[in-house]
């Protein structure tokens, strides 16, 4: 995939659970939607798995993942787990004319956004991770990011040292 999801964006979530997809992410979603010819584009929001965020994939990327799942032997625990968490616990999403989506109830539940927080207004963080992007509740994202960096990298270390294992 030539296009990649990059960057970190904080977006307001309104009382109706609407949130604007960052403009750079919209371009990648459009490029990865084979049916897009202007107007509304689509992507897949996955809320399965044991995590505090939802993952979002372009239609093309999700088709590649589905093909990999199909290649696993039917009925195996690995295939059933992936089918449940990547296919069953996923929704096709369509951006409205303003580039927004309505965060679905299952997605809001995964993020930990309560009805009271929606009424008062809350914020979501969109984090690009190459072939997908994540949507987090903003305060959860900030806490997780700080904790992860503390564990992975000593202060002052070169972050590219984490790539040494790749052999590239």
UniProtKB/Swiss-Prot annotation:
PROSITE patterns: SPOVT_ABRB (PS51740). One of its GO terms (biological process) is negative regulation of DNA-templated transcription initiation. CDD domains: MraZ_C (cd16321), MraZ_N (cd16320). InterPro entries: MraZ, MraZ_C, MraZ_dom, MraZ_N, MraZ_sf, SpoVT-AbrB_dom, SpoVT-AbrB_sf. Keywords: Cytoplasm, DNA-binding, Repeat, Transcription, Transcription regulation. One of its GO terms (molecular function) is DNA-binding transcription factor activity. GO terms for cellular component: cytoplasm; nucleoid. Residues 8-51, 90-140 form the SpoVT-AbrB domain. It is found in: Cytoplasm, Nucleoid. The keyword Transcription regulation applies. NCBIfam families: PRK00326.2-2 (NF001476). Forms oligomers. Belongs to the MraZ family. This is Transcriptional regulator MraZ. The lineage of its organism: Bacteria, Pseudomonadati, Pseudomonadota, Alphaproteobacteria, Rhodobacterales.
């Amino acid at each position: 995939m030539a296009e990649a999801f990059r960057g970190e964006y904080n977006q307001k979530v309104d009382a109706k659970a609407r949130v604007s997809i960052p403009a750079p992410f919209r371009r990648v979603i459009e490029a990865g939607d084979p049916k897009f010819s202007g107007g509304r584009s689509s992507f897949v929001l996955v809320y399965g798995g044991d995590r505090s965020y939802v993952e979002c994939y372009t239609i093309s990327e999700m088709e590649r993942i589905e093909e990999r799942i199909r290649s696993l032997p039917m009925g195996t625990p690995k295939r059933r787990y992936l089918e449940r968490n990547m296919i069953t616990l996923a929704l096709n999403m369509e951006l409205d004319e303003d580039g927004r989506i309505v965060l679905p109830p299952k997605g809001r539940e995964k993020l930990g956004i309560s009805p009271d927080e929606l009424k008062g207004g809350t914020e979501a963080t969109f984090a690009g991770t190459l072939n997908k992007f994540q949507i987090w509740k903003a305060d959860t994202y900030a806490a997780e990011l700080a904790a992860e960096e503390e564990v992975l990298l000593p202060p002052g270390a070169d972050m590219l040292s984490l790539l040494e294992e790749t052999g590239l």
